[in-house]
């Protein structure tokens, strides 16, 4: 599922599914809304998906940097990727998954943000913030996430 759509009774649909999940693509840094307003709206959506089943939900897709389809599609400012991921977990998610891991070589999503860009560099900000910095935060709370220290170092 993705955001709110009129005509869909999410709680009725929740009775038919095993796990609630959604794709989260907030429009950070848009001129008509503060970062705080975007965060509050996103928090409400996380709470909606948690409450659908009364248990943790899966965040199936989120962008580590920007999208290729929103009216305003700016690179996330430093710290926003971490804020967004930690907010997701704080509101009951069992996962924070990114679309896409590696930038597409062609087609419609070639210019959609990715953890690893077209140049494959590990020193790019989306890679550092979504894998290394965020992993450091998660490693404090989730022992199973310690695998990330093998990639980013201690």
Predicted regions and their residues:
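Carbohydrate-binding surfaces of carbohydrate-active enzymes
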Residues: 14-18, 22-154
